[in-house]
Design a protein with these regions (language model features):
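Glycine-rich phosphate/diphosphate-binding loop of Rossmann-like nucleotide-binding domains
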Residues: 1-41, 46, 248-249
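Conserved short beta-strand edge segments in small beta-sheet-based binding/regulatory domains
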Residues: 221, 257-273
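Proline/glycine-rich low-complexity loops and linkers
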Residues: 50, 78-163, 167-184
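N-terminal small/polar loop signature for handling phosphorylated ligands or for N-terminal nucleophile
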Residues: 25-86, 92, 103-106
Length: 273
């Protein structure tokens, strides 16, 4: 059985609307391509107290959680510090992170044709990006070598921290999936089967939904209302989703009951998750 996957997107710029989040859709895509699914997503500003609480909850779970943003070295970057507080450990300069940061410093100096001085004040400050919670491991960054980090939570969780830049975060998340999660790929194929019930009201469909879930406990029933559609008008997409071997029986009961009750049914939709 695969674990639950979660996402924490950090940054005041997301909540204020200065930047639009691109991570949610991409993480859903990366997981879906591997037969996995996102269970939840949290959005948190650069508020140390709220961020610490969010990460404590993630750490206490048994989930795999990706956290994007706030791991830089400016005063508004609070994710590294909040992660350490959430885990009850101190921050410490990770030796591999130090080496990678200095490698990046040397690369930039070489590109500019300048001497490399690791003791210069700004270069010493850059080492703060390698201050990770004690016990953390390196998360490689193929874009510019400045690493993220991964931590184990007391509940058995795995927390993976990346920069907020999509060009860095997405390949880092993909690296975690390929190197840490491959044994869960396509382990439990999921599907959904639904139908558009035209002119229906959710209240009238609720008893049927409850009955299907009682009869098929491994399957979830869903309803998605649309108020006005240019072709189908007001309707409800009613369906079942779950393991591929469990959905057909639940679907047959659902559609038979709809036909028996005289519901006006439109197109059916089948989707592999």
């Amino acid at each position: 059985m695969s674990p639950k996957f979660g996402l924490v997107v950090v940054g005041d710029e997301i909540l204020s609307g200065k930047r639009m989040d691109k991570h949610l859709g991409k993480v859903i895509e990366l997981l879906g391509a591997r037969g996995l699914a996102l269970s939840y997503a949290d959005y948190v500003g650069d508020d140390p107290e709220r961020l610490t609480t969010t990460l404590q909850r993630a750490a206490a779970s048994s989930d795999i959680v990706f956290c994007t943003g706030g791991i830089g070295a400016t005063p508004d970057d609070q994710t590294r510090q909040s992660a350490a507080r959430a885990l009850g450990v101190a921050l410490a300069l990770h030796p591999e992170a130090k080496a990678l940061i200095q490698e990046r410093i040397a690369d930039v100096a070489r590109e500019k044709g300048e001497p490399c001085d690791f003791e210069r004040a700004d270069n010493l400050h850059r080492l703060n990006m390698g201050m990770f919670p004690e016990g953390a491991s390196i998360l490689p960054n193929p874009f510019n070598k400045i690493p993220g980090f991964s931590c184990q939570g007391p509940g058995g969780s795995a927390l993976h921290f990346t920069p907020g830049f999509p060009v860095m975060a997405w390949p880092m998340i993909e690296w975690v999936l390929e190197n840490k999660c491959a044994h869960w790929f396509h382990l439990a194929p999921q599907m959904e089967h639904s139908v558009l019930v035209l002119g229906a009201m959710e209240a009238a469909l609720t008893p049927l939904m409850e009955r299907i879930e009682r009869h098929h406990p491994q399957v979830r029933v869903f309803s998605l209302p649309t108020v006005s559609h240019p072709v189908h008008g007001s309707h409800i997409e009613l369906g079942v989703k779950g393991p591929v071997e469990r959905v057909p029986a639940a679907w047959e009961e659902l559609i038979a009951d709809l036909h028996h009750s005289g519901a006006k049914c439109g197109p059916e939709l089948v989707r592999t998750l």
